[in-house]
Structures are given as structure tokens and as C-alpha cells.
Amino acid sequence: MSLEDCYNVTQSYAAVAIHKEQTADYVEAIALFQKAKRNILMNPEFKYARERLHVMDYEDRHYVETLLCMLEQLTIRIEFLTKEIAQQEAAYKDIQNTQKSLVTQSSTGSANVAYISGNGPGDRSFIDDGNYSASSFERQNRTAPLQSKVTTASLKPNIPRTSMSSSPTASRTSLRKGAGELETHSAVKSAKKASVKSKSVLPPSKSLARTGLPAEVSTQNNANRAALLAWGSLNSSKPKHALPPSYISSEAAQASRSSFQVERHRPTPDNSAVIEAARRTYSSISSSSSPFKKKTQSHLPNRTTEVPSISKQLSKSSTSIATVAPSLASVSSVTKSPSPTPQSAPRAQSASTETAQDLDFLTPPRLSVNNPFLSDLYPASEQGLSSCEEKDSPVDGDEFFNHTNEEEIIEKQFQSTSISAMTSEKQEQILRECPDIDEELGKSILREIVVSGDEVHWDDISGLEFAKHSLKEAVVYPFLRPDLFQGLREPARGMLLFGPPGTGKTMLARAVATESRSVFFSISASSLTSKFLGESEKLVRALFTLAKKLSPSIIFVDEIDSLLSARSSDGNEHETSRRIKTEFLIQWSSLARAAASRQTADHPRVLVLAATNLPWCIDDAARRRFVRRTYIPLPDETTRRLHLNNLLKYQKHSLSLEDIEAIVKATEYYSGSDLTALAKDAAMGPLRSLGESLLFTKMESIRPINLDDFKTSIKVIRPSVNLQGLERYSEWDKEFGSQGH
């Protein structure tokens, strides 16, 4: 995985993890942050570039520095969330212990009041809050002497009763309370509520909120909810920032919706606005049909007395979070322009803005137009396979992570590091729109579409500047700006790349497909032949029909001489081969238009791009349709030097500039593929010198590649091009080529 791909995948994981953190799903957030961290640490290119940062070029060094900053921030977020989970669990345990002690104290106080008024533990009419009988009082009163050995009946004679005969409950067996008991019970409950309000309550985490609190202290539930409202964490609306549709429909997202919807708290110096918002929010939630309505109907907290006490706890918690939050913005200044810290951020801030600020430290230093993950930024007419899909307007520049199209881009990055192949539903949709072709033949042609994943860019090809310029002018620019290339400027419908084998003709075709962002049909002779009579012509018709449907598109035919060889009149040519050539030429001619009389953009745009090592074997009619015929020669000294430097860029070697010049001089008449084979064989030299000991030698102990390795390999790897054949290429180029030499 390249450094650019590693950055994009890591950013996708981090974006979803930040959403998990904002919805208080800290466990899932930690897991995704750790996955993003492993994606960086386990990347071999990052490991290699990290050790050789001082010798890297500007672009790679920029990506490595960005990944290092991301790695630091991911570690900070993991540590912060781990501590947050531990603090919330400890706070929840304190709440549970407090509730248990409150229940014990209230039941003990009720028993003492009832005992003084004449209702002793032996009287079964004593009940606290409708739940406690005499036997339950015996289990909770731990201070009673010899409680485990005596019963209620044995305790009755030993307890001094002040007015046994005058007790209103002395002679009755009913569990219903009398008038005096009701008055005493209401006093106990008011004391119990006052003690609950005086306790500080922390907002429980999302995982703990699902378990619920004991039913005996339902007022504690209301206090917890009031604390969450004052904290600014309870929100009944959905998250305002965009997320991938695949994630929104997943079980994890459904589980997060069933609990609290929590947004990250931004500390503010003034808590009065937060308290007022908590009051309004609580009143609106209590009156709506929320999942907490049934729990809060019977016991509503006193808003005038509870919310101010919670605001004190809010101010304390705000200071603790403020010490960690600025760490996100501390690195954003390294990778991007300075952004306001959380302390200077406005109070009224939406969730989408907070998400964009959280992603600042993950924003790359530069967005490359060659990034395969940015295909959603272009219009549907420029996306090839995506032209049949309905998409939003394009996004440019820094709006890449702030626009509503973020969910499509994150989903595309999170699923794979390349554009996935067309699904069967997509194929059926395209074939239904093309009823004049057979369904099975159409599927066979669609399988020839090259799926992006091993993109080739102009910088990956050494030299060949004239060929690159010709391809940009004939293919790339017209596909990217069709409004400029109209009328007489209409691009050519055919282009031929010819030259010796191994000079980069196929690489140039792949680079054209990548740079023009078009559908790329890679066709060979076997793709258009069938054992059934007449199906080969139908395959050719289906090829051009689908190319028009999915335009802008490129039909690339490698070794075109095997498909469109010169037709003979002596009868030696097979009938099937002749019919295929005729149908191909007819369908190709249907792409041409009278350009001089047209002033509008020609749709669809389809280019037939071909490569051959035998240009003199191509049929005359096919040669006429190749308007641009570009010669790809053997690399010169400058190209060979550049190619060698690219091959040795990430290798451990001890070659000096003089050594490289010596290798360049010794590799005359070597093609690009010959130089690659030579460098690979020379790289095996240090391993060959170890012999059997290479099985036990560490990587660091292997010597670098030197000049002697190349001298030895030159004796083995010889040029593959015939010198007499080069003269024939030059003659054909002078006669039919786009530029004579």
C-alpha cells in the first residue's frame, strides 16, 4: 500500500471513530482508532520511508510527516478514551454505592420513626414505602443484638413499648397504613429526596446507560437525566454530520441510536446559558414521546433546585476535559493552516462543524488530482462507470471533508482501496438500456473493463515526453474539458502506439486511462472471437455499443496487428477473421463525425487506442482510421538514467553518480523492460554472495547493491531488440508516423 493510500484508509477509519466517540460509543471508537494506528504501523512503505526521511522527495516526505502526526494523535485519542471509560465506570460505581446507602438509611430512619410512634419490629403492619415488612426490617437492621439467633416473636417481650394498648396498629393485622403512619411516611420520603438532591451526579457512559438504575430510587434516574441535560450531552435529534450509508444502516449505528445521542462537550466560561438550555430541553423532552417518557412521568425533578447544583459539577468536569481537547489542534498547524482551538471556538457550534474541526489534524498537506479516492469529486459525465449513477455536485479543494458528499467519499474509501467491479445489478441496468445487444454477449464485454487498483500515472513512466504530450492533447484534455474541444478541435477517434517491444506502450495506455478518468476496455483477439458462427461480429457490435453507453471510454487493443492485419485477396484469409475485421471497421467508422460542421460537444466520446510491434502488418483501412500514429523509441541516455534512479529509489545501494553513468553507457539499445530486468538481477547479487548463509542472515546485515553486481548482470541480461528491426521502425515512422526521426 502506497503512502497516499495508507493516508486515505487511515483517515476513513478515524472519521468513523470520531463519530463513535461523539455518540459515546467509546469502546468502538477505541477499536477503530487502534485499527487506524495499525494500518500506519504495519505499512512496509511507511516503515521504510520513516527510516530514510532525509533522502525522500518532497511529496513522500510530506505524506510521511502527516502520517507521523496522525499516529501521534491516534495514540492520544486512545489514551484519552481509555481514561474516560475508567472514570465513568468509577463514577457509576459511586452512584450505585450511594443509592444503596440511601436505601439503607431511609429504611432505617423509617423504622426508627415507626418504633417511636409505637410500631415496633414485631408489628407486621409496619411498611416503609409499601415494600418493607417486619422481616425485611430485621434483615436490614444490622445493629440489632443477636438478630441472627432470635425471631420476631422472641423480641416482643424484651422491647419496651411506651403505649402498647393505645397503638392504633396493635390489634389489627391489615397491611394498610393508618393516618399517623401516612404522615410519618411522607416525612421520611421528603427527607430521602433531599438527600438524593445533595449528591453530585456524573453522566454515565452510553454502555452503562442501557442497564438502568434500581426501581426503588426512580428519582435518581431523573437526577441523572438532569445532569446529562446540564452537561449538554443529551440530544434527541440525529447526528448532523454525514456518515456512510453502509454504516448508517449497520447494526452498530442502530444500537447507538437506541441509547443517548451524545455530542462532544465544548467548555464555555459561562454556565448560565447551558443551564437555561438544559431547562428548555428537559421540558421539551419530558412532554414528547421519547424513550424516557414512561420513566419520568411519575417522578419529575425539581428544576429550580436541582439544575443549579448540577452546574457546579459541570464547571468542574469542564476544566478536566479542556486539558485534553487542545491536543487535537496542536498538530493541525503542522499539516494545515492554523484553526481555532476548542477554547476559542464559538459557543453555538453544530455537530458537523465540530466533526470538521476534529478532522483538521487528519487533513493531508496536499490533495493530489491523481488520488484514486477522489473520483467522487468529478461530475458523473467524467466518471466512466459512475456516469449511470445519480450523484451530487462535485466538491473541490478543502471542502472535501466538509461537504455533504463526505458520506459517499468515506464509504468509498472504507470499502476498498480501489474502485470495485460492477455488480450484477449494475450490469443488468446497463444492458436493459441497450436492448439491441445480447445479454450474455454484453456481460462478456463488461468483464473486459479494467478495474482501477493498479493505477499508472505520468510520473511512473520515465522519459517519452513527446508521447505523453501527444496523448494528453489527443485523449486526456478532450475528455476532461469537452467544452473546449468542439467543431474543428474535435479529438481524433483513433491513436496508434508503435515501436520495439518493452518500450512502455502498454504503460502509456494505462496512464491515459488513469489520467482521463474514463472507462478502459482492454481488448485482445480472444475477447472478440467465438466458436459459434456470427457471434464474433455481435461481440464487436456489443463492444462499441457499451463503449458509447459508458462514455467517455477508451477501447485499448494490444497487439492490434493480430486483429486488424492486412486483408489478402488470394483467399488465404479465413472467412471468420475477415468478417471480424469488417465489422470492427464499420463500428469504428460510426464514431466519426463531420467535425467541420459541428459546433457542439460530441457525445459520446470513444477513442480506439492500439499498440503494436508490427505496424507494417496493419490493414490500410485501419491505418487510415488511426489519425495519430506515435513512435515509441528505445530510451535515450537521459531516460535510462532517470529509469535507473527510479528503480533504485527504495533499494539499499552504494552506487555513486559515476557508477550510474557507467551503467547508462553500458546499456545502450536496452529497452525499458530490459533495464528493469537488469536491475532485478543486480539486486540478487548481495543474496547470491551469501550462499546458504542467507537463511540465517538478518536483513540489516545484507550488503548494498554495488557496481560489480550490475557488471555481472549485464553479461546475463542482454538487449532484446534486433538492431536491424530498429531501422525498419524508423523508416515506417518517417513514412506514416506523426513525427519523423
From Swiss-Prot:
Residues that bind ATP: G499, P500, P501, G502, T503, G504, K505, T506
Domain of life: Eukaryota
UniProt KW keywords: ATP-binding, Coiled coil, Cytoplasm, Nucleotide-binding, Nucleus
Polar residues bias (residue ranges): 137-155, 298-308, 346-356
Record has Coiled coil as a keyword: yes
Cross-referenced Pfam families: AAA (PF00004), AAA_lid_3 (PF17862), Vps4_C (PF09336)
A molecular function (GO) term: ATP hydrolysis activity
Family named by the database record: Belongs to the AAA ATPase family.
The protein's name: Uncharacterized AAA domain-containing protein C328.04
Source species of the chain: Schizosaccharomyces pombe (strain 972 / ATCC 24843) (Fission yeast)
